[in-house]
From Swiss-Prot:
Protein name, entry field: Sulfurtransferase TusD
PANTHER family: PROTEIN YCHN, SULFURTRANSFERASE TUSD
Function field: Part of a sulfur-relay system required for 2-thiolation of 5-methylaminomethyl-2-thiouridine (mnm(5)s(2)U) at tRNA wobble positions. Accepts sulfur from TusA and transfers it in turn to TusE.
Entry keyword set: Cytoplasm, Transferase, tRNA processing
This protein's encoding gene: tusD
EC number(s) from the headed UniProt entry: 2.8.1.-
Length: 128
């Protein structure tokens, strides 16, 4: 089966994002196709390059990055939700005259069209 995941919880503070990551790993381990993960609302914090967990804590941001790189999963961040929460790539940082960007490499800013496309092309869309 072909899956897409929607993550609406932040990297830390709730269990939504970590549960979504565990589910994503279970999918690929069972041979399913995970085409994309769409981070929406507070979920965009999973792409913040400046997140710095303590050395004895799990680094969820880098774990998402590794999932995307190892399994070819698109990591899409809702651009509107990201901008509201201060998450920007180089292009948006320049456009908005910000000092720097903080979007973790491997993630892409995208619109709700990416979520709509995933909904149309996947067998299942699971939200966390």
């Amino acid at each position: 089966m072909r899956f897409a995941i929607v993550v609406t919880g932040p990297a830390y503070g709730t269990q939504q994002a970590s549960s979504a990551l565990q589910f994503a790993h279970a999918l690929v381990n069972e041979g399913h196709e995970l085409s994309s993960v769409f981070f929406y609302r507070e979920g965009v914090y999973n792409a913040n390059q400046l997140t710095s967990p303590a050395s004895d804590e799990f680094d969820l941001v880098r774990a998402w990055q590794q999932l995307g790189a190892q399994h070819g999963v698109a990591l899409n961040i809702c651009v509107a939700a990201a901008l509201r929460r201060g998450i920007v790539d180089e292009t948006e940082a320049k456009r908005l005259a910000l000092a720097s960007a903080n979007l973790q490499p491997g993630f892409s800013l995208s619109g709700l069209g990416a979520l709509a496309e995933a909904s149309l092309t996947c067998d299942r869309v699971v939200q966390f």
